[in-house]
Amino acid sequence: MEISWGRALWRNFLGQSPDWYKLALIIFLIVNPLIFLISPFVAGWLLVAEFIFTLAMALKCYPLLPGGLLAIEAVFIGMTSAEHVREEVAANLEVLLLLMFMVAGIYFMKQLLLFIFTRLLLSIRSKMLLSLSFCVAAAFLSAFLDALTVVAVVISVAVGFYGIYHRVASSRTEDTDLQDDSHIDKHYKVVLEQFRGFLRSLMMHAGVGTALGGVMTMVGEPQNLIIAKAAGWHFGDFFLRMSPVTVPVLICGLLTCLLVEKLRWFGYGETLPEKVREVLQQFDDQSRLQRTRQDKIRLIVQAIIGVWLVTALALHLAEVGLIGLSVIILATSLTGVTDEHAIGKAFTESLPFTALLTVFFSVVAVIIDQQLFSPIIQFVLQASEHAQLSLFYIFNGLLSSISDNVFVGTIYINEAKAAMKSGAITLKQYELLAVAINTGTNLPSVATPNGQAAFLFLLTSALAPLIRLSYGRMVWMALPYTLVLTLVGLLCVEFTLAPVTEWFMQMGWIATL
């Protein structure tokens, strides 16, 4: 018997999301206008809390849908205006271009990145050195490329290698269900479990590496570009401004990588089983023999384009998004990708997040119109200039660990800029606060997958169930990094940021605008 119209509508609404989640969103949509009539300020904060809730529940439903419904209602009932949303989007056009074009551009360089990580995995036998190499490679690449793309490449390598060994272990040559272990005997299962532990640790090291590198440059994370634009910094300025905090954090993060591997803490320390290495090496040898001259020239071209990308960013030859567009044009032209559908695949990863970011800007418009963060900012600004830096770092960190860091970074830099324009803080203090906001937004966010988009991408990937990487296990494995990155970052903001920045100014390396 066919279901009723009402039941059909209920099932279609937010698709496979749990019933309690659907009901919660409907309650939000009903309650918000009623609260807005009584107290716009309370209604605004309620909207922010609801939006953070949708981000925290990203595994239940992609936040664009529930967050978008809340944002549309907010505009309809007058919490903000469509014109203000348009102004926020226009002011952050560079970030949208970064997501649309840079992420798509790096998609066409995946062969080179796959080649790099494959060579690392098979060339380095020491697990400590291999873990450090993955962390450093991910950090370096994420300083210039999109972190999601770097993680996507490492996932591709891991899934490919897992599939190769799984087929051997299950004695099947054809593609099989990688989650089906029923055809694997006990001995192979023990080796497979060890291999899973090995891949889990490598993925976490690479994920943290993207955070370590991503915080250092204006293109490392989307919120970095928002903060750089608000402060009027170019690529080199941004790197130097952040370095009093980010360089010590990078060093301590890499030492943490070595320490957890050496002591086998928090689920780290598993080595690559020799039987697995033999299987993977045989496969790689066959692949290299089959690589044609055309394939080799593609890798060379992609490496040259990579040099162009780094040079163009460092010299600020154009806006970041336009440099990304040039990468798309060069990579597709010189590697023979001419089909519209093949080019279109490059945009599938970035456009949903670009749409979600536009919804973020709608909520930011509400925050500005309803002056939601004014009490918090006033509280922070009542403290001494020195204490303000730590307070901004801590408030950013707390919110970023449970919510999206683009959203958090945008809110706080807007509030700090408004305080500077009103004369509440000096330009020099504003620039120091911008560093505290950027580092506070990026570093503590490794605590949960909700804070780091790269972690969330890993958790929702096809690899996570294969290597038994759950939400809880990811939080546990990230814990040593969370503690070290957060505390070292706070100490640097407290003690090294102001004096080192002052020294940079005396040396003439940076200047207050």
UniProtKB/Swiss-Prot annotation:
Keywords from UniProt, A to Z, are: Antiport, Cell inner membrane, Cell membrane, Ion transport, Membrane, Sodium, Sodium transport, Transmembrane, Transmembrane helix, Transport
MF terms from GO for this chain are: sodium:proton antiporter activity
Task: Read off the InterPro entries from this record.
Answer: Na+/H+_antiporter_NhaB
What membrane topology does the UniProt entry give?
Answer: Multi-pass membrane protein
Give the UniProt subcellular location, in the record's own words: Cell inner membrane
The record ties this protein, via PANTHER family, to:
NA(+)_H(+) ANTIPORTER NHAB, TRANSPORTER ARSB-RELATED
Q: What does this protein do?
A: Na(+)/H(+) antiporter that extrudes sodium in exchange for external protons.
* Cross-referenced HAMAP family: NhaB
**What is the protein name stated in its UniProt record?**
Na(+)/H(+) antiporter NhaB
